UniProtKB/Swiss-Prot annotation:
It is found in: Endoplasmic reticulum membrane; Mitochondrion membrane. Gene3D superfamilies: NAD(P)-binding Rossmann-like Domain (3.40.50.720). One of its GO terms (biological process) is androgen biosynthetic process. Its EC number is 1.1.1.145, 1.1.1.270, 1.1.1.210, 5.3.3.1. NADP(+) binds at G10, A11, G12, G13, F14, V15, Y155, K159. This is 3 beta-hydroxysteroid dehydrogenase/Delta 5-->4-isomerase type 1.
Length: 373
C-alpha cells in the first residue's frame, strides 16, 4: 500500500488520542491530521512528541463548519470519525447532541465526497443496538441479529441515525470519480486510563467517604479496553485500503469487545479501584421495576414543567435500562473480516487502569480525608 494520510476527528478525546498514538506507528503513513474543537495544552504537547517519520498536524475546528471540514479532508486517504457528544443523563441540550453527532457526521461525509476521500470509518456505539428493555437478555449477540435501539433519547438516536448515514454513503461517487467506502465500529462500554466515566465515578466515591455509587448492579456487560478499541480502528483503516479485504468490509458494522470478563458496571468499578481502598455501596436499593417507573414519573414532571422551568431528573428510563441490562456481544465478525484480536488482555488492562485510578486517588486524597473525619 502506497503512502497515505489519515484524518481523525475527536482526536483530543478518550478514544481519539489512542488512535493517533497508534496511527503514527503505521507503515507508509505520511501524515496524521488530528481534528477537535479544542485541544488541551497537555494533549498538544503529547502529540508534538509523536513527530517521527509521520507528520502530526493538529487542527482546531468545529464539526459543524463545512468549510473547515473540507479543508481538513483535502489530500486525505482515510477519515476516522470519533467526534461525538456523549450524554445519557440529560445535561446537554438535545439539539446540541443531534447537531454534533448527526449533522456533524453528515457534514463530514459530504466533505469526504467533495475532497475525494476514499475511506471512512465511523466510531459508533453499542447504544445504537439497545438495550431497549432491562427484561430482555442478549448474551454474545452478533451482527446477523436484528438489534436496534428504539429510544428517542438524543444520544442513542443520534448515533443510530449517524451510523445509518455512514453505511448508506458506502458506494457514493467521489468528486474525482472514485468511490467512498465506509464501515462502522460499535464498541461496548469503553474503560481504561483517562476514561471520563471512571474518573467521575472515582471522584464521586472520594466525596462519599470512599463508597462507590450504585450505577448498574443488575447489569451484565462486556466492557472493552480503550487500547483494543483503538486497535480495531487501525485494522479497519488497513482493511478498507486493502483491495483484497475491502470488499468484505465495505458497508458493514462490527461489534468491538475483548476478553474482559462479563460483569456489572458496579463490579467493574470496584474491581478496578478496590486496591485503593474504595468499596461498593452495600446499602439497600429500590427494586428495578420501581426505579424504572419512578424514572417515568420524573420524566413526566420534567415534560410538564418544560414551558416554564428546565427540570432535569436525576435519572431516566434510558439510563436505568442501559445500566441494568444483560447486553453483551461477540467480536467474531471483526475477527473474521478485520483480523481483530485484542492487543491487551484483561489482566494487563485491569492493572493499567487500576494504576491510573491510584494516581487520581492520591491527587484527590484530601477529599477522602476530609469526608472521613
Amino acid at each position: 500500500m502506497a503512502g497515505w494520510s489519515c484524518l481523525v476527528t475527536g482526536a483530543g478525546g478518550f478514544v481519539g488520542q489512542r488512535i493517533i498514538k497508534m496511527l503514527v506507528q503505521e507503515k507508509e503513513l505520511q501524515e496524521v491530521r488530528a481534528l477537535d474543537k479544542v485541544f488541551r495544552p497537555e494533549t498538544k504537547e503529547e502529540f508534538s512528541k509523536l513527530q517521527t517519520k509521520t507528520k502530526v498536524t493538529v487542527l482546531e475546528g468545529d464539526i459543524l463548519d463545512a468549510q473547515c471540514l473540507r479543508r481538513a479532508c483535502q489530500g486525505i486517504s482515510v477519515v476516522i470519525h470519533t467526534a461525538a457528544v456523549i450524554d445519557v443523563t440529560g445535561v446537554i441540550p438535545r439539539q446540541t447532541i443531534l447537531d454534533v453527532n448527526l449533522k456533524g457526521t453528515q457534514n463530514l461525509l459530504e466533505a469526504c465526497v467533495q475532497a475525494s476521500v476514499p475511506a471512512f470509518i465511523f466510531c459508533s456505539s453499542v447504544d445504537v443496538a439497545g438495550p431497549n428493555s432491562y427484561k430482555k437478555i442478549v448474551l454474545n449477540g452478533h451482527e446477523e441479529q436484528n438489534h436496534e435501539s428504539t429510544w428517542s433519547d438524543p444520544y442513542p438516536y443520534s448515533k443510530k441515525m449517524a451510523e445509518k448515514a455512514v453505511l448508506a454513503a458506502n458506494g457514493s461517487m467521489l468528486k474525482n470519480g472514485g468511490t467512498l467506502n465506509t464501515c462502522a465500529l460499535r464498541p461496548m462500554y469503553i474503560y481504561g486510563e483517562r476514561s471520563p466515566f471512571i474518573f467521575n465515578a472515582i471522584i464521586r466515591a472520594l466525596k462519599n467517604k470512599g463508597i462507590l455509587c450504585v450505577t448498574g448492579k443488575f447489569s451484565i456487560a462486556n466492557p472493552v479496553y480503550v487500547e483494543n478499541v483503538a486497535w480495531a480502528h487501525i485494522l479497519a483503516a488497513r482493511g478498507l485500503r486493502d483491495p483484497k479485504k475491502s470488499t468484505s468490509i465495505q458497508g458493514q458494522f462490527y461489534y468491538i469487545s475483548d476478553d474482559t470478563p462479563h460483569q456489572s458496571y458496579d463490579d467493574l468499578n470496584y474491581t478496578l479501584s478496590k486496591e485503593w481502598g474504595l468499596r461498593p455501596n452495600a446499602s439497600w436499593s429500590l427494586p428495578l421495576p420501581l426505579l424504572y417507573w419512578l424514572a417515568f414519573l420524573l420524566e413526566t414532571v420534567s415534560f410538564l414543567l418544560r414551558p416554564v422551568y428546565r427540570y432535569r431528573p436525576l435519572f431516566n428510563r434510558h439510563l436505568i435500562t442501559l445500566s441494568n441490562s444483560t447486553f453483551t456481544f461477540s467480536y467474531k465478525k471483526a475477527q473474521r473480516d478485520l483480523g481483530y484480536e485484542p492487543l491487551v488482555n484483561w489482566e494487563e488492562a485491569k492493572q493499567k487502569t487500576s494504576e491510573w485510578i491510584g494516581t487520581i486517588v492520591e491527587q484527590h486524597r484530601e477529599i477522602l480525608d476530609t469526608k472521613c473525619q
